From Swiss-Prot:
GO terms for molecular function: 4 iron, 4 sulfur cluster binding; 7,8-didemethyl-8-hydroxy-5-deazariboflavin synthase activity; iron ion binding; transferase activity, transferring alkyl or aryl (other than methyl) groups. Its EC number is 4.3.1.32. Consists of two subunits, CofG and CofH. It catalyses: 5-amino-5-(4-hydroxybenzyl)-6-(D-ribitylimino)-5,6-dihydrouracil + S-adenosyl-L-methionine = 7,8-didemethyl-8-hydroxy-5-deazariboflavin + 5'-deoxyadenosine + L-methionine + NH4(+) + H(+). The lineage of its organism: Archaea, Methanobacteriati, Methanobacteriota, Methanomada group, Methanococci. It comes from Methanococcus aeolicus (strain ATCC BAA-1280 / DSM 17508 / OCM 812 / Nankai-3). Pathway: Cofactor biosynthesis; coenzyme F0 biosynthesis. [4Fe-4S] cluster binds at C54, C58, C61. It is an enzyme of class 4 (lyase). The keyword S-adenosyl-L-methionine applies. Belongs to the radical SAM superfamily. CofG family. This is 7,8-didemethyl-8-hydroxy-5-deazariboflavin synthase. Its cofactor is [4Fe-4S] cluster. Keywords: 4Fe-4S, Iron, Iron-sulfur, Lyase, Metal-binding, S-adenosyl-L-methionine.
Amino acid sequence: MVEFLNSKNPQDIIDKLSLINNNGNKNIGNGNKTNNKKYITYSKNVFIPICNWCKNICGYCTFRRENYKLMNKQEIKEILLTGNKHGCREALFTFGETVDENPKIKEDLKKMGYNNILEYLYDISDWCLTNTDLLPHTNCGILSYEELKTLKEVNASMGLMLENSSDRLYNTIAHKDSPGKEPKKRLKMIEDAGKLKIPFTTGILVGIGETNEEIVQSLVDINNIHKKYGHIQEVIIQNFRAKESIPMSNYEEPTPLKMLKVLIVAKLILKDISIQVPPNLNSETGQLFLFAGVDDWGGVSPITKDFVNPEAPWPKIEELKKYTEEFGYSLKERLPVYEKYINENWLSCKVLEKIK
């Protein structure tokens, strides 16, 4: 049996694990009792893939391109200004991990006047804060403590998917060619963000060959870090989607029942952390996941697509509102930083001034 790190009551965790196994079916429907809110939140955003090259070659990813595109400033500014006109409040900035290791990209950046991608990102984020009502949220792979510290100045929140904390899984088709997916590196960054008091989003990926024990262990690992620093505002429970162009195209997607069970366990373990499922990856079943205590839909864009899952269009906000209300909740727009973190203890003066 897996060791549940720092758990005060391992048997309690083992009991939660049983909810994912077959004898947990009777618990379906109990998860929504843990959601005391009368609303489900979402963030109206723009998705800006600054560069789609990546050092990692994950078995389930379609984002990475060898024939990469590095967006120029004008392209990015146009999207930000369009988002501003449509009332978006979040600018999701993303690019592949350690893109600076690609000499062609480094050369392109130098031609633009930047030594590295983080200088470019900082400049773009600063422009965004100064010229629009959007708040930057960056998710760009592994960053050092100092890099996080610098980006905190111009970001309302940041994120990194843990995906799974299993060393075994790291050596499978999912991550064997992805040095940045080594669990200890990702856990360290999540912890560094806590030390720096950065409001943070993380999550797990379900259906990439993990065991039920590894799912629970990953959630426990996230919770243990959060208990130390209190900075994790939401955890995404993301279901694997099979695509023809990926090495894992023959992998089965997790069933709705499996997702329900994982979501219930996540809510029981993570308690005060919001649980998010991407509505565009669960267009037929997302409404059912509210039974499991899901309380956030995440970022939804009226003007940009999901560049990580381009085959899955965002629902229209009116549609999201309709099936949220059908369940008995109201739909509430939020910022990329949760309300409890909007103070000088968590945000830079520049970001806080923009919000207030």
